[in-house]
């Protein structure tokens, strides 16, 4: 009797262990879990540090908060969505390269791939800016939104450039900002001089950049989308509520949630 019981018990334990492994595997494959409100969508989470666009030892980490700074109350005292955000830390003069500053992109190389640049209509984010960051690099020492693209320009044998949004100064420091609209503030430029009228020395609006890329060819397509910082000044802060068209990307410690924009 005891032998039979021991054998049965062993089989039960083995089945339970196998079930736990399967459950763990499937729960780990989807970290952007719907919260059951505000139109959250459950989907595979393809967000993370884009390693080939990273220099030095920067930090881009899904974190709780920031909450504050101390003494700050009301909506600006916590992330605009949920409890978390994307924490970013980059240093200057910290590598053996020239310049010596760090760079990081936290982005998605899957879900936007092949989307038309002409379809970008609403872009922006919320930022937690600090007075220290302003001291490090001035009022406009801010993170960026970057889209790697294939310009597909007629007569130009080049299939790579990066669209970069440079925000204006944050309207507040040491607390969360409201939504900063990348279609009406700051400026955009293209790397690589694909469109000279929208390079880093010739600032463009998003509308002007889209128009410059619309030269009658196949049309520019997106390769990746990211929030990043560098290479310029030290910056330690956070971003949340990245908006791309009608989707808001809510950065949480458990992953990146998607919400429908109102």
Spans of features found by a protein language model:
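Solvent-exposed strand-to-loop "edge" motifs in beta-rich extracellular domains
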Residues: 87-91, 126-140, 150
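Extracellular beta-strand ligand-recognition surfaces/modules
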Residues: 139-149, 176-258
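Short carbohydrate-recognition loop motifs
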Residues: 71-105
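A carbohydrate-recognition surface predominantly in extracellular/luminal proteins
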Residues: 39-49, 118-130
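Extracellular/lumenal carbohydrate-interaction signature centered on repeated Trp-anchored short motifs
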Residues: 108-123, 213-216
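Secretory targeting and sorting signals
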Residues: 1-34
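Acidic, glycine-anchored loop motifs typical of Ca2+
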Residues: 153-158
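Extracellular glycan-recognition surfaces and repeat-rich motifs
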Residues: 36-84
């Amino acid at each position: 009797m005891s032998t039979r019981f021991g054998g049965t018990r062993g089989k039960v334990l083995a089945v339970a262990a196998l079930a736990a492994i399967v459950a763990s595997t499937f729960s780990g494959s989807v970290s952007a879990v719907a919260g059951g409100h505000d139109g959250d969508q459950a989907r595979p989470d393809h967000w993370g540090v884009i390693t080939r666009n990273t220099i030095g030892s920067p930090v881009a980490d899904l974190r709780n908060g920031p909450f504050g700074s101390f003494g700050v109350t009301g909506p600006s005292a916590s992330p605009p969505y949920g409890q978390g955000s994307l924490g970013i830390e980059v240093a200057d003069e910290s590598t053996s390269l020239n310049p010596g500053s760090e760079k990081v992109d936290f982005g998605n190389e899957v879900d936007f791939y092949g989307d038309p640049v002409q379809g970008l209509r609403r872009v922006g984010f919320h930022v937690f800016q600090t007075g220290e960051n302003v001291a490090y690099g001035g009022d406009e020492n801010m993170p960026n939104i970057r889209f790697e693209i294939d310009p597909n320009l007629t007569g130009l044998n080049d299939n790579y450039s990066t669209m970069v949004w440079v925000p204006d100064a944050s309207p507040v420091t040491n607390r969360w900002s409201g939504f900063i609209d990348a279609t009406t503030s700051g400026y955009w430029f293209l790397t690589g001089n694909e469109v000279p009228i929208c390079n880093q020395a010739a600032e463009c609006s998003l509308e002007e950049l889209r128009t410059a890329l619309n030269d009658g060819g196949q049309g520019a397509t997106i390769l990746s989308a990211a929030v990043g910082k560098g290479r310029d000044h030290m910056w330690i802060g956070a971003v949340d509520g990245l908006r791309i068209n009608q989707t808001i990307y809510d950065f949480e410690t458990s992953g990146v949630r998607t919400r429908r924009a109102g």
